[in-house]
Amino acid sequence: MDQSVAIQETLAEGEYCVIAVQGVLCEGDSRQSRLLGLVRYRLEHGGQEHALFLYTHRRMAITGDDVSLDQIVPVSRDFTLEEVSPDGELYILGSDVTVQLDTAELSLVFQLPFGSQTRMFLHEVARACPGFDSATRDPEFLWLSRYRCAELELEMPTPRGCNSALVTWPGYATIGGGRYPSRKKRWGLEEARPQGAGSVLFWGGAMEKTGFRLMERAHGGGFVWGRSARDGRRDEELEEAGREMSAAAGSRERNTAGGSNFDGLRPNGKGVPMDQSSRGQDKPESLQPRQNKSKSEITDMVRSSTITVSDKAHILSMQKFGLRDTIVKSHLLQKEEDYTYIQNFRFFAGTYNVNGQSPKECLRLWLSNGIQAPDVYCVGFQELDLSKEAFFFHDTPKEEEWFKAVSEGLHPDAKYAKVKLIRLVGIMLLLYVKQEHAAYISEVEAETVGTGIMGRMGNKGGVAIRFQFHNTSICVVNSHLAAHIEEYERRNQDYKDICSRMQFCQPDPSLPPLTISNHDVILWLGDLNYRIEELDVEKVKKLIEEKDFQMLYAYDQLKIQVAAKTVFEGFTEGELTFQPTYKYDTGSDDWDTSEKCRAPAWCDRILWKGKNITQLSYQSHMALKTSDHKPVSSVFDIGVRVVNDELYRKTLEEIVRSLDKMENANIPSVSLSKREFCFQNVKYMQLKVESFTIHNGQVPCHFEFINKPDEESYCKQWLNANPSRGFLLPDSDVEIDLELFVNKMTATKLNSGEDKIEDILVLHLDRGKDYFLSVSGNYLPSCFGSPIHTLCYMREPILDLPLETISELTLMPVWTGDDGSQLDSPMEIPKELWMMVDYLYRNAVQQEDLFQQPGLRSEFEHIRDCLDTGMIDNLSASNHSVAEALLLFLESLPEPVICYSTYHNCLECSGNYTASKQVISTLPIFHKNVFHYLMAFLRELLKNSAKNHLDENILASIFGSLLLRNPAGHQKLDMTEKKKAQEFIHQFLCNPL
């Protein structure tokens, strides 16, 4: 999820969030979550300055309302960002990165998550650091003065712990923070410095080509960075290619000189075994990653006599692949079969819906009973925590409980290391490998996709971990799809959303993100929630009792949908020889005896896709009774490509020799199949795609869409090019998709005519010329993104009005009244709002999970068209789709129901209902009408809470963030103030209006 969007909503005009990353601020024993954003400001004289904005939050940072500005650190000349660790610290593969931020009098320590986002963040911070040219004017940061606390003078030190928006000015603020010996080069523009004795320096496929070379240290093992003269083009190219392509392929040379255990040119394994003398040196508690165990617990879990460390270097800097290196890498991939062979490794895949329970039983009956020790464990959970706190916020103690239970349940005959843990609300995935294989795991990435309502709720969706094992790419997906027997289409949509939205960044930034399908091996597990259809409960139970699973399987929804090629096309599932895994009475093997008496079903499944995969077992585990589901496991033998060191070296030398003969003086040239693109009748939240092909000539080239002068991005906010950059071999093609999507951020200006579907894209060739692409089209105005007062003055459907009238009404001031206007008499509330609420009032007041279960995308488009054309009689959609459309409508309002100007007054009187009503009475007439109308509707829903299971807290949480929004560019609220906003709405749900 791109959290820079949430930060951007808090910034003033001229300020731009370049990139954001989630981290943890470490102060002594304290651990506090922080969102770090690098913000750029363009100066009037043409230069630019940067600052690091630190935000507090507990809820997922989706919009600006979810974050609260805590502190600002200008990126000045004395600013440095450095990876740190205590002497002899041991890293677990995939663990968090600890960095120290230093200015003249400021020192803060953060833990950042392992992955490409951290790598890109650190790279952008390094680029932002000002140079050391004395002739260059020092940054002044005058633009940050607006964020300083009004009651504080510039000369006053910044009080530590102040939760207001603070600017940490060089020389004025002193905030404590531990300092630790450096393990990596400093971030900023300093040169890399040799490490002290006893340190170990790691490198891998993501190192920048800075002119530094790897040299053996004179004293003891290990290597240091230093400058050296080039000693021949051939040796340098082999060395550089080996460093930058270790993720793709290569040989594994052991360098034993001086007692070093450093792994040299490594094609696939990225870790470096730590010297034996390092064992037993525990990582201080102050530097423990939030999701990692203490060192003693990790060692016990790994059961290892030697600890394997990860290649931390490959996440520290963005690669800058040269043209020659990319060509070498491409040729190596093409010749992969010449230097690799297939070797089988044993994989365990398991899935368990734990129904919000804590672990009560030993998991060895599921994870290790009756099988040989697997080489890799992939363990997925669903419904880890069903509490409302977990539903709306990040943290849950259940994560640590189940992590510990799994670690203790791994096979006792082997030693394992945790590679990665990823969680989205109640969906969690764990990846472990045998200790001896950890050195061959690389390019670990983890991502999440929520498919809950409005994309906000992670109660449904998927998490995935992708990695390179030797020379085979593997992706493991754990998903929890929509519930209820009749919602199979929603499940199909969830699957498609996960496939389309799950993207993993590559080490090479010039390459587009990887999708799930871009892997050699895919394992997909989870509670897919497909049920048995067309059979009553008793018939299902009878077939189970007779063990006639083949007959029962004929009515399985997943089988039917796969056969229809609507989901999991190309995937394989083993034969179901075990009884359905859902639904049981908790603590027993008895089928559901509750009032709902749900029919048994194979909800929990494991599928796979790829070559050289053999399933050895597929079973459920009836002995575990903690949940109303039974866990499922599958064991596979998976053929993985392993590098032959000698053959790799020969192949690499042949490629380098052949490239020595190439002429590099040629200017690249391409041809484009199309240069003008017209998007006709663009609609709100409806993706439009136009494609074209780039055909390369005879010279390899890099291409990229570049920014036009004085613009923040290469295209307007509603447009995107996929991929936006890449590399082309001679006489090769690549298809580019221009994707146009109008959302709440862009709809209002398109409605008003302030913006149009017009843009020019600049396609740049490295060492070549630029190509200009013209984009045009027309946008169909929509009620989504239109102001409340505008819609009240539109008695006709918006699509029946002239564009001039729509523009005039949209640009009217929000405080326009209903008297004295020369326009037609307005309606009290927007007719579009009435249509949706009336539909829900007539059809959905008793609907279970209303406003909590997402609708279908196709139905939303139908609802939008009915509202915009006024053809309400044609409205035919599920209650959940109409409910989600209502929420999207409120979210798209450019001025929220409770106007920005009264927002803080609402917070101040959230505990006083009389004062709260007084604030509402000051709203513009149309906004006040809408607020009272919505509150009356929600109170009607609460009258039916016995059927729809809604309560005041759920509705206040959902509607609070939609009706109450903080003004853009103002300081965001902390968690205490967010609760005040919820309490404000809660009052109107519990008291008479």
Swiss-Prot record:
InterPro entries: Endo/exonu/phosph_ase_sf (IPR036691), Ig-like_fold (IPR013783), INPP5B_PH_dom (IPR031896), IP5 (IPR046985), IPPc (IPR000300), OCRL-1_2_ASH (IPR048869), OCRL1/INPP5B_INPP5c (IPR037793), Rho_GTPase_activation_prot (IPR008936)
Enzyme class: hydrolase
Key words, A-Z: Cytoplasm, Cytoplasmic vesicle, Endosome, Golgi apparatus, Hydrolase, Lipid metabolism, Lipoprotein, Magnesium, Membrane, Metal-binding, Methylation, Prenylation
EC code(s) of this entry: 3.1.3.36
Region (ASH): 669-782
Positions bound to substrate: 383, 459-460, 582-583, 596-598
Name this polypeptide is given: Type II inositol 1,4,5-trisphosphate 5-phosphatase
Native source species: Homo sapiens
